[in-house]
Amino acid sequence: GRVRSYLIKNRIPYSEKPHATPHYHNVVLPKAGGRRGIPTIEFPDGRVIRDGVAIVDHFESLNDNLHSPSTVRQSAVSRLLDAIASEGLLRPCMHYRWNHDQSNREFLQFHFETIYKDHSNPSKMAADRMQEIRENVNPAWGVVPETHDLIESMHVALLTKLNQHFSKHPYFLGSKPCIADFGMMAPMYG
């Protein structure tokens, strides 16, 4: 979400490719240090950058830091809000994505089948990966039945505050997006 929104806002052309392809495993992954991660970007010259923050920072350096606040205070606030958004909101993101089957299952199945479309049985691979996330990844992030109510109440309180802010300002720090706005897209997308 962070990188996609940054690229769209800055009219930087891109195309998304599934990360479960032979090209990804044989070409991109070794250049990314053997560490899987989404997002990972491969440039036409073969360079690879893995991690949303690193990708946005790369384009910011080429873009005269267009979305990086110029004052120390605003820069610190922007980076703090970015970290809170992209890391601190991961738990509610995972909860709402994976614990509401009636509204999300079809989307998730489609999404994961798309990732594995070049494999012999994309439906089975998608189902297996989804089960792995539910059974292992979510509990590792503290997304367990005992925390669902707390996650939801804290998330609703935060959304209420964000709604109050964004009803007066189009972005976190005023009239143009900053790094925090792109970071907020990470947990809000999908």
Where are these regions (language model features)?
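GST-like fold's C-terminal all-alpha helical module
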Residues: R91-G190
